[in-house]
């Protein structure tokens, strides 16, 4: 029986790079040969703290891209060689929220890398329910695999921009200059934000942030963020505040950063 390499979660603090059996493609499934898979913050948290949603042993990884290797006999609309990505939290398609079109709120979400083997492997099986419910997306030609693999986290930033109703002329504050904070920064600009304020405490991420497209970079170790935002907005406050740092104090501070009737997104997970 053929084997492949995979990063397998066995429990809290126990993640192994090991050989597993290459999965076979069922009639209603797709098998994808993975060529890029990102590491999400939730993967790190799972390793450090465990995760009750995980069903070990299981291959990790939900931010992936790859080429379809095998198409199940009953699958239509996909061909071998197509590059695909996924909305990897698979909805049931039947609950109250799914019927309303709010599949992200599905009461039976089964994510790749949690409920189904994920993309930190040479091959992954995309289950029939994911195909049926529209979770598989073809990638246009010319996009690099490592860029395509970021479609899932970028879609989260797009969701934040849409829920915060970012429009042309807005002043947007992003707190936290990690990968997701920077993605939110770029997406906010694409949605028309006129002024972008990026805040990060002193350290490596602050140094890296100096190369990104923001109008004001705030070192929160040395500067008072609330005072800076007030000064940059004529004392009014920001139209939108996106907190991409899982810290209670920063999340509480967001209220002081936003103007009256402003919009706040607690993008990062709670502490």
Residue ranges and their predicted role:
Residues 65, 85, 173, 197, ...:
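Structural detector of well-ordered beta-strand residues that form the stable sheet scaffold
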Residues 84, 172, 237-241:
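Receiver (REC) domain switch-region micro-motif
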């Amino acid at each position: 029986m053929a084997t492949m390499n995979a990063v397998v979660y066995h429990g809290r603090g126990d993640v192994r790079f090991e050989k597993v059996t290459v999965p076979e493609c069922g009639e209603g499934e797709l098998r994808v040969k993975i060529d890029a898979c990102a590491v999400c913050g939730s993967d790190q948290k799972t390793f450090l703290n465990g995760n009750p949603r995980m069903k070990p042993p299981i291959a990790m990884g939900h931010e992936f891209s790859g080429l379809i290797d095998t198409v199940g006999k009953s699958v239509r609309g996909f061909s071998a060689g197509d590059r695909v990505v996924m909305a990897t939290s698979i909805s049931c398609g039947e609950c109250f929220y799914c019927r309303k079109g709010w599949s992200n709120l599905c009461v039976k979400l089964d994510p790749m890398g949690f409920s189904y083997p994920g993309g930190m492997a040479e091959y992954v099986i995309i289950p029939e329910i994911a195909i049926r419910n529209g979770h598989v997306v073809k990638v246009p030609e010319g996009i690099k695999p490592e860029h395509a693999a970021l479609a899932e986290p970028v879609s989260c930033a797009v969701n934040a921009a849409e829920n915060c109703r970012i429009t042309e002329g807005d002043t947007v504050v992003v707190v936290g200059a990690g990968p997701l904070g920077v993605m939110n920064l770029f997406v906010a600009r694409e949605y028309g934000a006129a002024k972008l304020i990026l805040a990060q405490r002193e350290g490596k991420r602050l140094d890296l942030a100096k190369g990104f497209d923001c109008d004001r970079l705030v070192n929160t170790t040395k500067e008072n963020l609330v005072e800076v935002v007030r000064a940059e907005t004529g004392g009014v406050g920001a139209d939108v505040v996106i907190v991409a740092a899982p810290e209670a104090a920063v999340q509480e501070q967001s209220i002081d950063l936003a103007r009256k009737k402003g919009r706040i997104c607690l993008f990062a997970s709670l502490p």
